[in-house]
Amino acid sequence: MSTGFLVEDVLHLATDEKQSKSVDSRISFGCGRVQTGSFLDGAAPNGLFGLGMDKTSVPSILANQGLIPNSFSMCFGSDGTGRISFGDKGSPGQGETPFSLRQTHPTYNITITQVSVGGNAVNFEFSAIFDSGTSFTYLNDPAYTQISETFNSLAKEKRETSTSDLPFEYCYVLSPNQTNFEYPVVNLTMKGGGPFFVNDPIVIVSSEPKGLYLYCLGVVKSDNVNIIGQNFMTGYNIVFDREKNVLGWKASDCYGVNNSSALPIPPKSSVPPATALNPEATAGGISPASAPPIGSHSLKLHPLTCALLVMTLIASFAIF
């Protein structure tokens, strides 16, 4: 639990048009002062940008003011850049799956019907929440065991078992002179048949005091809820359409989302993807269009500066 202050301020936005206009809106947001419970694990956030379905969230406020359609998108680039666009309802050709809404405390919950690891597909159904405020993906059984054990059986490098200081159970040792490696590709099939190719299911970390580099399957075992975190959303423009109650996704580098001219993001000002570990992360991944059973990675390492549950996103705020 987090306690602190709930305040109101003005959010300055720009319309996503050739002649962009400035739009100001009063919003509410919280600043956490005292953190307890799960917020003490890893790093305690100062606050989260409210994007949920509650009436006090930023998209709800903007929609209720008549400024936007009741929808928004978030784009997560493989180099750490990103964009959030309020009012975005997606684009033609995007994948879609319906939200499975609860009557109380609705979340962005979807249903997954198939998991494929390294080309080995298994049909079973489970629900998961798409949560951009969580850095990694959390799964309980049977999904966690199915994905992790299949990944482990196909990984070529030696597994590192002494990883008690890491949240990941399945990590593999890279040799000192190794500059690239291959790993089993993880793909999901959503309810309705839409494929969701996970571009970057791994995390590169440094192991001290051994001085080794490891790559880990970026999935943490959960005791209860399944969460698709930011790492599985990398390389996509993710649309949260609250009017149609569907989740949409389409491959994107996040620099030319919907050909927007509003507040462009300069490529050289990027920051690495969010993580909780002070490790290194790689840029790149496999193309969703090809989705081979084996992906490859080059060790292009950058220091990370952000913490679990604090999504570091170079965000261009736009209203559609």
Label for each model-derived stretch:
Residues 260-261, 266-306:
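C-terminal GPI-anchoring signal of eukaryotic secretory precursors
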Residues 1-275, 312, 318:
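Active-site or ligand-binding cleft "flap/edge" segments
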